[in-house]
Amino acid sequence: MQLKYQSKQKAILLLEDGKVFEGKAAGKIGTTTGEICFNTGMTGYQEIFTDPSYFGQIVIMNNVHVGNYGVEESEIESDSIKISGMICKKFSDGFSRKRATDSLQHYFEKDNIVSISDVDTRSIVRYVRDKGAMNCIISSEITDIEELKALLAKVPSMNGLELSSKVATKTAYEIGEKTAKYKIAVLDFGVKKNILRSLTQRDCFLKVFPLKTTLKELTDFNADGYMLSNGPGDPSVMTDEILLIKQLVETGKPIFGICLGHQLLAQSQGISTYKMHAGHRGINHPVKNIITGKCEITSQNHGFTVNADDIAKNSNIEITHVNLNDHTIEGIRLKNKPVFSVQYHPEACPGPLDSRYLFDDFIANLAK
């Protein structure tokens, strides 16, 4: 199929600091707002767009071509697109791949995703890298900059924003065979499908619980262990979930946290979190495993991180992984309980396989 690039209608990208970029409309015609961020991955745009951790964010795709291989049902990480918008250099409203079932253009239109193309994405990435994360607005229907500034001024900062309730399940549900060897309670803060797949593939029966689940509801399930999922937003404001996790730690059962789950686990142990300058988003972030001394290439998507100074004051917590680019904390474990977590995504698909062993470590804790 011949690839086509939509380039008919003008679109505007306005950043919170007043910087303006002009391009062409992609996806649905309209206006959208969110926090601007960038992903340096070269593939996997459908998985990125459906990742609940991106809720409330407008993603710059550093890869030049987006949409050229279409979309396909098996490559989703949730039941709908979760990004607020997308920025790219070249947007294909046609596609060339045998397995693809639809174009990205139609996919965006169905989920009302407003985007902009034909902009210099690399210069925008450098700008955001240097200036830091900030809110932005994309519009393919409003051309007045002052009107856009007024709309953008109403958008809340990601700092202090609770977003898991927007993407987590509202009711509990089960996945896998009830005859499986292990029972896992998954606390859903915006869980990715591949986390669930990674557990069921390891002979686990899962029950996924919504936010505001009580300790009694979890203990009544009599799980062998607990999975703390990924998700969007600022972990520090999720006080109910932090208290619940603290209570789960005290049960002594195995716990594995990923991304937001990692941050909430840290908060439950008195470790603070803070907003990063620009965050980590991509599929090639180098992380050192301090236990083995090996370097792992990891997939990441987070704008908050845990405070290393607080960990240094806590004799019960051990740092297990650090980022080799900026030395931020990427993994921790408790010294006296089978509890550990990582900031990155060992389940990532597409992405490196270096850290899949963490699921096996969790299973090993269940078997003890």
PLM region spans:
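RNA-binding accessory domains that recognize and position tRNA/RNA substrates
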Residues: Q2-K216, D220-F221, P235, C349, ...
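Proline-centered loop/turn at the N-terminus of a beta-strand
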Residues: V114, K183, P254-F256, S272, ...
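Active-site glycine-centered loops adjacent to acidic/histidine catalytic or metal-binding residues
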Residues: D120, C259, H302, H345
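Residues that mark the start of a beta-strand
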Residues: K181-A185, F205, P254, I297, ...
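Cysteine-nucleophile active-site neighborhood
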Residues: G225, S229-I297, G303-A308, G351-L366
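Catalytic beta-strand/loop cores that center a nucleophilic Ser/Cys/Thr
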Residues: K294-K337
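A glycine-centered loop/beta-turn motif at secondary-structure junctions
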Residues: G331-K368
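Beta-strand-turn-beta hairpins that frame and shape the catalytic cleft
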Residues: K178-I184, T292-C295, L334-V339
